[in-house]
Amino acid sequence: MKHLSIDIETRSSVDIGKAGLYKYAQSPDFCILLFAFQEDGNPVEVVDLAQGEEIPEHAVRMLADPDVTKHAYNAAFEWYCLNRAGYRTPLEQWRCTMAHGLYCGYTAGLDATGKAIGLPQDKQKLAAGKALIRYFCVPCRPTKTNGNRTWNQPWHAKEKWELFKEYNRQDVVTERAILNRLEQFPMPEAEQKQWQMDVLMNAFGVRVDTELIKGALYIDAVSTQELTEEAVRI
C-alpha cells in the first residue's frame, strides 16, 4: 500500500470560523492556492497553483487510486476542498492524522500535538503561519495604498509568498512525523468508520422523512396556537 500525505492552502471570502468548512468551500471565489504532498518517504513537493502550476498527473491519479492511502491533518478539510476543486478522491481512502491523535489522547492542534509528542524543531510547524494565512487567504480591505485590491496576490509580497510555500511544505513534514509516531498505536477500524460517518453527515446531512417532518411542524403550530388561546382565556 502506498501512502500520500497532503496539505493545502486555500482562500475564500467566506469566514470559515463563522460559517464552517462547507459554506467556505462552496463560495464562488474559493480556490486552492498551494498543494503540498509527499509520496511515502520521498521529499515533500509544493505545487504553486496560484501562479499557474498544475498538480502532477501522477499525483492526481494517486488521489483517486484505491491502492494509495491519503493522509492529512484534519483530513476532512483536504478531502472536501479537493473534491470541490474537481479532484475526485473518495473519503474511504483517507486517514485523518488529527483524529488518530485524538484517539491516542493528544490535542486537535497540529502545532500542539507536534510539541506534545516531542518532535525535534525541524519537524515542528512554522510559527509564522497565522500571519501568512491572514495576508493571502483572507480578503483585504481596498485602499488607495494597495490599489483598491481585495486580495493579496503572490506578486504583491514575493518574500512572504516563498515563506508561505515553506509553511505549506513544513505542515506535511510535521503531519508525517506525527503519523510515524502514532502508527505504533493503530486506530481501530471501528473508529475509522465512525470518523467517515461523521464527515459524510456533516458534508451531506442525513436522510429524513420530509412528510413526517412537515406533519410534526403542523402539529407543533396547531398545539402552540391552542395552548396560547387557552392561556389567554384563563
What are these regions (language model features)?
Residues M1-I32:
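Entry/capping segment at the start of metal-dependent catalytic domains
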Residues L4-I6, G114, A216, T224:
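Hydrophobic, aliphatic-enriched repeat segments that assemble into extended interaction scaffolds
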Residues E9, A75-A76, I213:
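An acidic- and aromatic-residue-enriched active-site/binding cleft used to recognize and process polar
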Residues S27-F37, G41-E183, A190, W195:
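Active-site-proximal helix-loop-helix substrate-binding element of RNase H-like nuclease domains
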Residues E189-I234:
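Extended, well-ordered alpha-helical scaffold/bundle regions in very large, multi-domain proteins
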